């Protein structure tokens, strides 16, 4: 059956940094499931509803045959078990990401010892991109087309137009 990996996140919205990691992960694993967290932590209320984030991710990732996009509401390790995945993929943009990601990986290992966490770093041109920065630039009327898929840029423009 091959190796199944899960790449979890809020993807609020999905950026070129995410898609870079997903494309590279798709080459490493037989099946890569992009797990969109439907209920992220209360301190991280999403700007886009889960249905919108799923649609934008599917649009941005169209054409990558071994990638699926699915929402999840459970603990990540339960989502991993449900899909019989062996690997969790996480991205590291900078050294500052490492401490938090290391803690998450350690907790996941305590909860499910048979699942490995693999860290990937983005291509240099994407290392500074984050969903929150993209949302902020868009909210202030900036052009985010270099950082996201055209459908995402349009969704952000539409969101800005709705805000009084």
From Swiss-Prot:
One GO CC term, this protein: cytoplasm
Reactions catalysed: (R)-4'-phosphopantetheine + ATP + H(+) = 3'-dephospho-CoA + diphosphate
EC annotation from Swiss-Prot or TrEMBL: 2.7.7.3
Location (main, coarse): cytoplasm
Gene3D superfamilies (alphabetical): HUPs
UniProt: ATP binding residues: 10-11, 18, 91-93, 101, 126-132
Binding-site positions, substrate: 10, 44, 76, 90
UniProt family annotation: Belongs to the bacterial CoaD family.
Assembly description: Homohexamer.
Protein name: Phosphopantetheine adenylyltransferase
Organism: Halorhodospira halophila (strain DSM 244 / SL1) (Ectothiorhodospira halophila (strain DSM 244 / SL1))
């Amino acid at each position: 059956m091959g190796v199944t990996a899960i790449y979890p996140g809020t993807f609020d919205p999905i950026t070129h940094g995410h898609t870079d990691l997903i494309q590279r992960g798709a080459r490493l694993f037989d099946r890569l499931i992009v797990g969109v967290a439907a209920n992220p932590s209360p301190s991280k209320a999403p700007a886009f509803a889960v249905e919108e984030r799923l649609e934008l991710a599917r649009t941005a990732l169209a054409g990558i045959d071994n990638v699926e996009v699915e929402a999840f509401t459970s603990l990540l390790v339960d989502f991993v078990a449900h899909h019989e995945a062996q690997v969790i993929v996480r991205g590291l943009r900078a050294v500052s990401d490492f401490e938090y990601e290391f803690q998450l990986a350690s907790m996941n290992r305590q909860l499910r010892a048979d699942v490995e966490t693999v860290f990937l770093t983005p291509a240099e041109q994407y290392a500074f991109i984050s969903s929150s920065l993209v949302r902020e630039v868009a909210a202030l009327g900036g052009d985010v087309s270099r950082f996201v898929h055209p459908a995402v840029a349009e969704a952000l423009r539409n969101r800005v137009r709705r805000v009084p």
